[in-house]
């Protein structure tokens, strides 16, 4: 058995499907939505529309993972400038604030983990007091289609606009896609005049290593 990123995530996807935590239809909808949202992202690598018929006809990489369910391996770079409170107001009258960051890791041994949930995400919800926050936008570092409905349910984002950039399914810059998610959340708060945004970054097999960031516009 391969332990590559795609292969190991097949294990998680099979478990989530078997336990009825996610569905095939949710994954297909994720791919279609990502391609539609790619129109909002000038840096997206994949912008062609995907219909239900196209998705169903796509070849399997490793059942039940199709090509459309996987991210394009992308080259690029990201940078972020974080300023102190007094310095931020030298650049803008309306800075976006980092209200909280939670960053933790789970075991690299897949056999010792419960792949139907995520303790690091659950800890972030508690540590950042996210349960009672109504988020306006979310950007998740979800490299495979099954991760989107999984994380949206864990983070209570089912009705929150998510990955309006298309997310990693339309452009997945190696070692930068998580930082991109934070930057895209910032951009949404600036351009849409929204109040609360949540960003997520991850690395390791099956969402092993997770960072959750709460961004806020102060009124």
Where do the language-model regions lie?
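Single conserved hydrophobic/aromatic residue that forms the stacking wall/gate
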Residues: 1-7, 11
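Secondary-structure transition/hinge residues
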Residues: 17, 35, 39, 189-190, ...
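Basic phosphate/pyrophosphate-binding loop/patch that engages nucleotide-derived ligands
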Residues: 18-23
């Amino acid at each position: 058995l391969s332990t590559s990123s795609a292969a190991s995530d097949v294990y998680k996807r099979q478990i989530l499907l078997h336990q009825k935590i996610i569905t095939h239809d949710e994954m297909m909808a994720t791919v279609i939505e990502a391609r539609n949202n790619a129109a909002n992202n000038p840096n997206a690598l994949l912008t062609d529309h995907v219909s239900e018929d196209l998705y169903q006809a796509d070849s399997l990489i490793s059942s039940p993972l199709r090509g459309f369910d996987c991210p394009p391996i992308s080259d690029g770079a990201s940078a972020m400038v974080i300023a102190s409170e007094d310095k931020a107001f030298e650049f803008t009258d309306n800075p976006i604030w980092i209200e909280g960051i939670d960053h933790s890791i789970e075991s690299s041994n897949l056999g010792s983990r419960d792949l139907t949930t995520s303790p690091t995400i659950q800890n972030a919800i508690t540590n950042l007091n996210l349960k009672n926050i109504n988020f306006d936008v979310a950007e998740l570092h979800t490299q495979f289609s099954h991760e989107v409905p999984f994380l949206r349910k864990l983070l209570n984002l089912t009705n929150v606009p998510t990955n309006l950039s298309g997310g990693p399914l339309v452009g997945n810059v190696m070692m930068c896609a998580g930082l991109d998610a934070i930057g895209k959340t910032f951009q949404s708060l600036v351009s849409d005049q929204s109040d609360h945004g949540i960003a997520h970054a991850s690395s390791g097999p099956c969402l092993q290593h997770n960072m959750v960031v709460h961004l806020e516009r102060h009124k």
